Amino acid sequence: MRRAKSRRGPCEPVLRAPPPICYSPSSPVQILEDPAYFYPDLQLYSGRHEASTLTVEASGGLRGKSVEDPLSSFHSPNFLRTPEVEMRGSEDVASGRVLQRLIQEQLRYGTPTENMNLLAIQHQATGSAGPAHATTNFSSTETLTQEDPQMVYQSARQEPQGQEHQGDNTVMEKQVRSTQPQQNNEELPTYEEAKAQSQFFRGQQQQQQQQQQQQQQQQQQGQGPLSHTYYMAGGTSQKSRTEGRPTVNRANSGQAHKDEALKELKQGHVRSLSERIMQLSLERNGAKQHLPSSGNGKSFKAGGEPSPAQPVCKALDPRGPPPEYPFKTKPMKSPVSKNQDHGLYYNDQHPGVLHEMVKPYPAPQPARTEVAVLRYQPPPEYGVTSRPCQLPFPSTVQQHSPMSSQTSSIGGTLHSVSLPLPLPISLAASQPLPASPNQQLGPDAFAIVERAQQMVEILTEENRVLHQELQGCYDNADKLHKFEKELQSISEAYESLVKSTTKRESLDKAMRTKLEGEIRRLHDFNRDLRDRLETANRQLSSREYDGHEDKAAESHYVSQNKEFLKEKEKLEMELAAVRTASEDHRRHIEILDQALSNAQARVIKLEEELREKQAYVEKVEKLQQALTQLQSACEKRGQMERRLRTWLERELDALRTQQKHGTGPPVSLPECNAPALMELVREKEERILALEADMTKWEQKYLEESTIRHFAMSAAAAATAERDTTISNHSRNGSYGESSLEAHIWPEEEEVVQANRRCQDMEYTIKNLHAKIIEKDAMIKVLQQRSRKDAGKTDSASLRPARSVPSIAAATGTHSRQTSLTSSQLTEEKKEEKTTWKGSIGFLLGKEHQGQASAPLLPTTPASALSLPASTTSASSTHAKTGSKDSSTQTDKSTELFWPSMASLPSRGRLSTAPSNSPILKHPAAKGAVEKQENSPGHGKASEHRGRVSNLLHKPEFPDGEMMEVLI
């Protein structure tokens, strides 16, 4: 038999499934031990009637005890339909699995009402097993609630679940056991399973017969219904002793055996069913010699916690000493049950008799109050005519309830089925009842006692007969157990043999398939060899036939060979001729290659010449464009000169009229000023001729350097413009942030911050104007070259007629200085590029300031002229001086204003970043120049275009755009 080693705590009962012998319908023990025998109407309250609390507790306690003590209780065949089979603590795994399968099949194939009854009985039995097994009931109830849906709703047949109550104290007390995975493989049932199934079906057939027998026995013993009550009370007390203790009677005596039993419980070693049955028979035979007194203590420790009913046992001592047993025991160490020591059941048909029976005993007050309460709360009727008594208390009672010597001698052992009587009847049988001072015993009480004694005697006789039958059953059980072992070993050997044979068959099959495959391969190989042999034979026969043909073919080939040799000689001669011809062709090809290379070289030279000519053509086109621009500029200048001439003529007429209306002496002023004016006109014409010569020279220089400087100027302009914009943005952003921070920190320096901002704005505008300067440099070069060309043309010719008025000629007073400056700049340009740029910028600025200085003289209104207090002669001389001085001062001061320190500008890069006419360079020098000009009367008009304009001469000034057109 297999063992399921389940660990549990010292206070938890071991829940076992009943042994297979319990299911034989022929054993008489199951008639006594079946709860339906003593309580035929102890049924499931599945209708609308609600049972009372005490009745449900009593019936549930009885079921719990009948399940929890498998040693002293054998179950009827209808036990298989009850839920106690689902308690998983059995040591015999095979029988437990068989019972699980049987209940599952009953739930699967039974009627819905039977299934619902089975499930309800499971929950009721596991939920009302008693207060001492709360943890076990909790875990088993949880396990059943987890398993019930699987039982009811699974359609396929399943193997046993194999869910055992395993684990230590903490697992049993605190955790719900998890269900193990189910096995769905279909297997043949083992011997135990088939045996249990056959017993189950036989038990179902004989169940109705047993119920009829039980009802007949109840009717025969219906005269003393209390006898059943007392008998069952003793039985339940006997069960309470051995509750949860599979190894109770293994020890002899003493505390050491008790410790050993506890140790065995902790280690989880559980004896098999055969050992327990043998020990039962031995203890029954020698019960008087070997009573395990220590088993009581062990059953107490295994049963649960001590109940508060121990002082009740002490209070019952005045009733009299307990009956003398044939051996010594320790009554104080014996465990007490969970409730009162009265194993008293009452029926609602005899409430008065029970109450009168309790009265003569001087029991303590708590027992009386409890019995009185039970009297006034009888369980309701459930439609049963002949009812035995219900359980007023939970079914566990005190172990050492006093009883008669006969009953103690028969039923003193723990595992016998003799059931001791409770306290009142045993006292009446052993000694006379003590007389109470308040009450006297009536004849009814004595009659009840006599009837009880008669019932006790009848029951003891029946018990003795049943003991004999039980002994026979034990012997049969031992034999059956041996048979079971042998059959199990045979079945195991058979299973191993089946496994080995199946394994051998599989190996044989594999070898057979392997050999068959090898045979097929060899057959194929043999077939291939035969085919090859046949082909070889055919080839050999064909070669012998071909030998004769080869001889004839050889003679034919010899004749052909001679012919081929003759043809070969002819072809060699032709080949030599072709080689000579090919050499001639190669020489001709080389000659043609040389001619082709020469032609390609000539083509390359022509292409280069073509590029040069195209470049000359482009230059000519550019010069033509410049010529057209110059012509347009000359036309514009002529128009401007004409306008100036008309304006000067008007001014002259105005002066003449003023002179006529004025005093007499100034009339001689024009006569005196005429030679001076003619001299000024001559000087201006000479200056014009010099400027034209310079223009031709500058045009030649421009033609030489325009191709070189064009790309460099464009790249430099783009790079400097980009760099200047990034620097200006960076400087403006940073300086604005810093200045704003300083304005917050130092409010007294707001003026300094504003000045810094103005300087930054000025720098930004300067950098924007720098790009314009580069463009102006290019235009200056063009004008200088054109002036050189024109000067070369007009040198041989005489002086051209003056197209300008004397006022324009007066503006060319410093021609000698300007020509010397430009000539010196030209010599420096030939030496170094830096001086070329400086000279060109100086010349441009000189021309600009010359034009700007002469322009304010032109648009002077007659009103401003009338406001002059001077005479006509003095005014004309002033004009002449102003023109000459303006031109001279502008050419002289231009280098001072815009080139204050030439040594501080070492390279062209510095000039590009800081332009020559930037306000940074102009600002301090301009102040000095203005201060110098303010001291002299003529220099103020030259500096008035910078921002300090006089009210007399600077009102209608020409715009910058018109001056640019004049320069072009």
From Swiss-Prot:
Expressed in exocrine glands, including pancreas, submandibular gland, lacrimal gland, parotid gland and sublingual gland (at protein level). It comes from the Eukaryota. The modification Phosphoserine is found at residues 253, 281, 307, 731, 804, 816, 840, 912, 918. A motif (PDZ-binding) lies at residues 965-968. GO terms for cellular component: apical plasma membrane; bicellular tight junction; cytoplasmic vesicle; lamellipodium. Residues 203-224, 853-878 have a biased composition (Low complexity). Its main location: other. It is found in: Cell junction, Tight junction. Residues 152-164, 177-187, 726-738 have a biased composition (Polar residues). GO terms for biological process: blood vessel endothelial cell migration; establishment of cell polarity involved in ameboidal cell migration; hippo signaling; positive regulation of blood vessel endothelial cell migration; Wnt signaling pathway. Polyubiquitinated by NEDD4, leading to proteasomal degradation. Residues 271-291, 449-645, 676-705, 748-773 form a coiled coil. Keywords: Cell junction, Coiled coil, Phosphoprotein, Tight junction, Ubl conjugation, Wnt signaling pathway. GO terms for molecular function: identical protein binding. Residues 152-258, 285-343, 721-742, 785-834, 853-956 are annotated as: Disordered. InterPro entries: Angiomotin, Angiomotin-like, Angiomotin_C. Inhibits the Wnt/beta-catenin signaling pathway, probably by recruiting CTNNB1 to recycling endosomes and hence preventing its translocation to the nucleus. Belongs to the angiomotin family. This is Angiomotin-like protein 1.
